């Protein structure tokens, strides 16, 4: 007998262009999502993105319409437990150079947690926290001036969902983002 209640394999390929049909980096990703009989889920994802033009950083500034960026790759692991009747929780970790659809110069790593408590069918409370750190985060400042930084971003989201029957729902969310960018260095783009 198997421990799994469901298993999904996903293979994605993305070929992207800008609005002028200039080719941008393409990406390939593979995801394995396994749901166990005890209502826990484990998700594993890996991706690869080719090197190439990135026009999102400079927003197509006329003197520097794009930046040539290196290839990217990485992985993500997520675990979710929904076995409790009144609570569920999730934990995740990712380490990657860029993202599946966004380029980056350096590595970033992040971990996140979610806890949700449902004391009754009509109300639930949740709290989410993520801590992301990135080396050589590239930021466009102005004109042809770019810089790299050591970036840290912490995100906290608290929420309350209230349901009355099938027709009414009230959602309240509070979000706090703490962002730091330290050790700035000038960056000369090769485009």
Where in this protein do the model-derived segments appear?
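Exposed, low-structure sequence patches enriched in small/polar residues
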Residues: 1-191
